[in-house]
């Protein structure tokens, strides 16, 4: 089994750019940014429970890494960068720390490196279980209306929230709930030590209005790019800013 993805081919000799979306996104999420790099071959992946991979379920990040590895092999991708946002960023960090042959580096936007104590994990598990129950049982428009009121999305205005609620409500609530629980921060290990000892290039992107993840970025041994005029979802709020940072990283 492999993950559904959309592949766009560029010039030979350059590494692939493999894009991983955030929770409730899909393979289209990164395309505005990715298509600015047409010289590179691009793979836009649907994570389990999302988009064309909605029917695929996992028990945790080990399964996600295994599926990603098999997907890369199926496309004969031997040399690549992982670019991930939020959930996709966490998946990228996990996979990179577990080891992926051919990995050039990891570019993470707003991805959490992991909680650091049992109390934080227990609190997050309670929260994610409550959200998962709502995703399973309530209309998605109502759930996402509340989801985007969370503090991490404070930089969004009302129009941006309405647009995101409409977009994300096309998902399957049951498969979102399953993925939320399987990849909760409550079950993700703290990756700080692994990232400090890494053997791959590691870059971190965060919006200038995303105070939580700017603080987290400061804890990581990563080259951090702050995206102006953006909050947590920087590639959506300021795609040109993210394109500029990726171009600098890739020396495009």
From Swiss-Prot:
GO terms for MF: 2-succinyl-6-hydroxy-2,4-cyclohexadiene-1-carboxylate synthase activity
Keyword Endoplasmic reticulum: no
GO biological process, one term: menaquinone biosynthetic process
Pathway given in the UniProt record: Quinol/quinone metabolism; 1,4-dihydroxy-2-naphthoate biosynthesis; 1,4-dihydroxy-2-naphthoate from chorismate: step 3/7; Quinol/quinone metabolism; menaquinone biosynthesis
Recorded catalytic activity of this chain's protein: 5-enolpyruvoyl-6-hydroxy-2-succinyl-cyclohex-3-ene-1-carboxylate = (1R,6R)-6-hydroxy-2-succinyl-cyclohexa-2,4-diene-1-carboxylate + pyruvate
Source organism, top-level taxon: Bacteria
InterPro entries tied to this protein: AB_hydrolase_1, AB_hydrolase_fold, SHCHC_synthase_MenH
SUPFAM superfamilies (UniProt xref): alpha/beta-Hydrolases (SSF53474)
EC number, UniProt record: 4.2.99.20
Keywords assigned by UniProt, alphabetized: Lyase, Menaquinone biosynthesis
Role played: Catalyzes a proton abstraction reaction that results in 2,5-elimination of pyruvate from 2-succinyl-5-enolpyruvyl-6-hydroxy-3-cyclohexene-1-carboxylate (SEPHCHC) and the formation of 2-succinyl-6-hydroxy-2,4-cyclohexadiene-1-carboxylate (SHCHC).
HAMAP family in the record: MenH (MF_01660)
Subunit structure: Monomer.
Similarity-based family: Belongs to the AB hydrolase superfamily. MenH family.
Protein name in the entry: 2-succinyl-6-hydroxy-2,4-cyclohexadiene-1-carboxylate synthase
């Amino acid at each position: 089994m492999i993950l559904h993805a959309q592949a766009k081919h560029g010039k030979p000799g350059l590494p692939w750019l493999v894009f991983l979306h955030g929770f409730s996104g899909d393979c289209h999420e990164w395309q505005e940014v990715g298509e600015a790099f047409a010289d590179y071959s691009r793979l836009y992946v649907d994570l389990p429970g999302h988009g064309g991979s909605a029917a695929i379920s996992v028990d945790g990040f080990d399964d996600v890494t295994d599926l990603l590895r098999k997907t890369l092999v199926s496309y004969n991708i031997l040399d690549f960068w992982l670019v991930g946002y939020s959930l996709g960023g966490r998946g990228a960090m996990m996979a990179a720390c577990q080891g992926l042959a051919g990995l050039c580096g990891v570019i993470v936007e707003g991805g959490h490196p992991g909680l650091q104590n049992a109390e934080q994990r227990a609190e997050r598990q309670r929260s994610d279980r409550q959200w998962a129950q709502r995703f399973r049982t309530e209309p998605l428009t109502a759930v996402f209306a509340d989801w985007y009121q969370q503090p991490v999305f404070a930089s969004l205005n009302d129009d941006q929230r309405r647009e995101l609620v409409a977009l994300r409500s096309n998902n399957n609530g049951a498969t979102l709930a399953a993925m939320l629980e399987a990849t909760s921060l409550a079950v993700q290990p703290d990756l700080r030590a692994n990232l400090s000892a890494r053997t791959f290039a590691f870059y971190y992107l965060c919006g200038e209005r995303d105070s939580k993840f700017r603080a987290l970025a400061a804890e990581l041994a990563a080259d951090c790019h702050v995206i102006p005029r953006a909050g947590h979802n920087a590639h959506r709020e300021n795609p040109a800013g993210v394109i500029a940072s990726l171009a600098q990283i890739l020396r495009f």
